[in-house]
Every structure is written in C-alpha cells, then in structure tokens.
Swiss-Prot record:
Family: Belongs to the THEM6 family.
Alphabetically ordered keywords of this record: Glycoprotein, Secreted, Signal
The organism's place on the tree of life at top rank: Eukaryota
Protein's UniProt name: Protein THEM6
Family annotation (InterPro entries): HotDog_dom_sf, THEM6_lcsJ_thioesterase
Residues that carry a glycan: 149
Signal peptide as annotated in the record: 1-18
A Gene Ontology cellular-component term: extracellular region
Lineage of origin: Eukaryota, Metazoa, Ecdysozoa, Arthropoda, Hexapoda
Length: 193
C-alpha cells in the first residue's frame, strides 16, 4: 500500500510518464537500432493518444509537439553517440531556441514518425531539423528547427571526431533567416533593459 502512495506522490509532483518515455526511447534505440552517423537522419515513431490531444479531443495539442521533439532529440543523441562525446569533454547540451511550423494537425489515434537531422553547426551550437510525418499519407504535418547550445566545450572540436563532418554543409536559407530573427529579438531585449 505504501508503494502506491509513493507512486501517486511521484505522479502528482513529477511527470513520470515523460521520464519513462525518455528512458524507453533511448534504450530501445540503443538496443534495437544500429548506430548512425551524426549526419544521418534518425526516426522515432509515435501515436497521438488521448493524453496528447487538445480540449476538443480531435488532434494533438501544440505543447505535445515540443514534448515529442524532446524524445526524438534524445534518440538522435543516443544513436549518433553525440551526447557521449560532448559529455566526455565535460560539456552539456541545452535547448537554446526552437521554432515549429504547424502545417496540418495530427488527428487522434493516428500514427506518425519524427525524423531528426543535423543541418548545420557552429562553434557553440548544433542546429537540428525535425519533421512530423503521418504514416497514413506521408505528409509533413509539422516541421521544427532547434538550436542546441553546447556548453563547456567547442562544437567544432567535438564534430572533428566524426569523419563525415569534415566538410560543414552550407547554412540553409531558412536557418539564416531564423537566426537573424533570433539576433533581432536579442538586440531588442538588450535595449529594453
């Protein structure tokens, strides 16, 4: 009986399902999928359930997209070994910015996949593109870009350990524009102080 009380308290205080899903996603990826190059696209699968929907119980709510992107990012780090290499240098990774474009809803009980790809990097951050694609029609329902700030180590040094990153790709045009918007926002916030 006391373990039920502890479990109930944990569910009230923490989002236990989030942590269970993180562990499951990372370990399932490591156990059942082959390692990937850091430049490869990684894929996880999901299903829009009753816990993911908006108040009208018809489609995934916007907050859940961001949560699912976390799982896909952790999976990417695990399969490519990137987080281990960052951690070996006593570094860390934190979300610096993200932008999601919602193109069409993901209806309740529809399966989907999230594809994650490293699209560019500089000395302080890596930039990922992630796409939500419904399995029934192959339509890209949402696309996200995220800036992963790498702390306490140099990204260029970390990525030198991957032969496939010897040549950095050109910065995609939409990434340039997004980074410009972030810089403008930063300048405005500095002026407001």
């Amino acid at each position: 009986m006391s373990w039920l009380v502890v479990l109930l308290i944990l569910y009230v205080i923490w989002d236990v399902n989030y942590f269970i899903r993180c562990v499951f996603t990372v370990f399932a990826g490591r156990l059942f999928q082959r390692k990937r190059k850091v430049t490869d696209t990684t894929t996880i699968y999901g299903l829009c359930t009753s816990q993911d929907v908006d108040i009208f119980i018809r489609h995934m709510n916007n907050a859940r997209y961001l949560r699912e992107l976390d799982f896909a990012r952790f999976h990417f780090y695990a399969l490519t070994g990137l987080y281990e290499r960052i951690r070996d240098r006593r570094g860390g990774a934190v979300q610096g910015a993200s932008s999601v474009r919602y193109r069409r809803t993901i209806p309740i009980f529809h399966p989907y996949k999230i594809q994650t790809k490293l699209i560019w990097w500089d000395d302080k951050a890596i930039y990922l593109e992630q796409q939500f694609i419904t399995l029934s029609d192959g339509f890209v329902r949402a696309v996200a870009m995220s800036k992963q700030n790498i702390t306490n180590c140099n990204v260029l040094e970390v990525l030198k350990t991957y032969p496939e990153t010897a040549q950095r790709p050109e910065k995609p045009e939409e990434l340039k524009l997004w980074l410009d918007a972030i810089e403008l926002s930063s300048q405005k916030l500095r002026k407001d102080k």
